[in-house]
Structures are given as C-alpha cells and as structure tokens.
C-alpha cells in the first residue's frame, strides 16, 4: 500500500506532465505550501530560470499581514506575485498547483493572482 507522501509525489508528477503538454511556451506559476508559509514563483521552463517569486516570509508580506499562514497571507502572496509578474511583462501563465488540492490557501493565492492581472 502506498503512503500518503508517495501518493502526493505521484499526483504532483502527473500534474506537471499534464502542464508541460498544454503550456505552449508559457511560464508556469508554481505554488508550494508548507504548514506555516506559502511560496509562489513564476518559472520559465524554456530557459530554466525563475522570473519572479514571492512568499509569506518576505518583509513586504509580513508588514501588511504579520506572521501568518492563513488564506489572507496566501491572497497577499498572490497579489505580490501578480504585481511583480506584470512589471516583468508576464501576463499569461500556466498554474502549477504542485499536487495540492485546489482549495483553501492554494485557491486564495490563485484568485488573488488572477485579480492582479495574471491569465490562467
């Protein structure tokens, strides 16, 4: 029987393979969430480089929200990543939820990024 971790890793791999199939050269918005923080980065897979990144650990996020790991912090990270991406000229991305269920903090980050000007 597979462990929960093995299932999670396989789900993430399945998700990334599917994303690469439909990406068509668009960078991907990758999300990682730990128990206390949430991180997002936009990665250009063609060059293998991170274009922009944001997390709930940054000073900009902690000044506005304080330390936190709730959906409000995720919304703030979504707004930050969208603002930075638009500055860099990135508007169309593919959302890589990294095997996480599209619910809670991941959903809050995605919706805030959409409101900030990212299309996915």
UniProtKB/Swiss-Prot annotation:
GO cellular component, one term: cytosolic large ribosomal subunit
Assembly description: Part of the 50S ribosomal subunit; part of the 5S rRNA/L5/L18/L25 subcomplex. Contacts the 5S and 23S rRNAs.
Positions of disulphide bridges: none
Protein name, as recorded: Large ribosomal subunit protein uL18
CDD domains: Ribosomal_L18_L5e
Family listed: Belongs to the universal ribosomal protein uL18 family.
SUPFAM superfamilies to which the protein is assigned, alphabetical: Translational machinery components (SSF53137)
Pfam family, one: Ribosomal_L18p
Source organism of the structure: Maricaulis maris (strain MCS10) (Caulobacter maris)
Function as written in the Swiss-Prot or TrEMBL entry: This is one of the proteins that bind and probably mediate the attachment of the 5S RNA into the large ribosomal subunit, where it forms part of the central protuberance.
MF GO annotations: 5S rRNA binding; structural constituent of ribosome
PANTHER family, per the entry: 39S RIBOSOMAL PROTEIN L18, MITOCHONDRIAL, LARGE RIBOSOMAL SUBUNIT PROTEIN UL18M
GO biological process: translation
HAMAP family: Ribosomal_uL18_B (MF_01337_B)
InterPro entries: Ribosomal_uL18_bac-type, Ribosomal_uL18_bac/euk
Key words, A-Z: Ribonucleoprotein, Ribosomal protein, RNA-binding, rRNA-binding
